[in-house]
């Protein structure tokens, strides 16, 4: 039986933690940062945990 391919688009967008949770980078940090406060930029820098309903589908794409 051949190896299952992971979806490369999905693997670039999330990372799996040691406990199996999926982390994703936040949006709104690419440009126009001069209009955001330092506090807002700090908050947006942190990675978010993917919702369980989405992580179920994402794990299928990652082959887990």
Curated annotation (Swiss-Prot):
Residues 1-64 are annotated as: Disordered. GO terms for molecular function: structural constituent of ribosome. It comes from the Bacteria. Pfam families: Ribosomal_L35p (PF01632). Keywords: Ribonucleoprotein, Ribosomal protein. Residues 1-10 have a biased composition (Polar residues). One of its GO terms (cellular component) is cytosolic large ribosomal subunit. InterPro entries: Ribosomal_bL35 (IPR001706), Ribosomal_bL35-like (IPR021137), Ribosomal_bL35_CS (IPR018265), Ribosomal_bL35_sf (IPR037229). Transmembrane segments: none annotated. Belongs to the bacterial ribosomal protein bL35 family. This is Large ribosomal subunit protein bL35. The lineage of its organism: Bacteria, Bacillati, Actinomycetota, Actinomycetes, Bifidobacteriales. The gene is rpmI.
